[in-house]
Amino acid sequence: TLDRSSAASDVYKRQALARALAPEPQLLLLDEPFSNLDGELRRRLSHEVRDILKARGTSAILVTHDQEEAFAVSDQVGVFNQGRLEQWDTPFNLYHEPASPFVASFVGQGYFIRGQLLSPDTVQTELGVIHGNRAYTMAPGSSVDVLLRPDDIVPDADSALQAQIVGKTFLGAATLYRLQLPTGSQLEAIFPSHADHQPGQQVGIRVAADHLVVFPAPGSVAAQVNL
């Protein structure tokens, strides 16, 4: 059922947006514009606002603490850390090519695992050897932290690498699993929801990381360079 207060807020926000656009401004400030709305109304209104701004050619600055909201509306997103701009980029690049460990851990979901650089684009980890699509300036043998997103881990019944399911969250089309490796390290993985694994079960997994993100481990210094 539709919450009446949320529906009233929806009408109010549409009216406020119409009034703000009436003078045909070149730049519009949107400060938490979708707060107090339920999930479905928030998603629908955010898409409508983006379409309206695009159609009118109006630039806007959106201030929000909601990542999903920022990604849905914005072409470029800035991530701030204690008042400092960490990265200004597209939503895609913020997720797949974070400029710092803070951005990597703040945007989306993911875990860092320790690894050793074997070559400019190859890392040895407890998950095996991972091949990347970029080169790093760190010397071979350097200790690095590898970011793995839930969509980087895929089920593989034939894999020698086994992980134990320690938690699960049903998302509808997919299920988010929390996995524990034999070393005790934990990762998250998204599997199709028709594969209904249970906590305590062992599953075969492998890494399928199209965008390998690597940072120098604490205590080492190196730069990251795209191929």
Language model regions located:
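Internal alpha/beta loop-helix hairpins
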Residues: 54, 59, 64-128
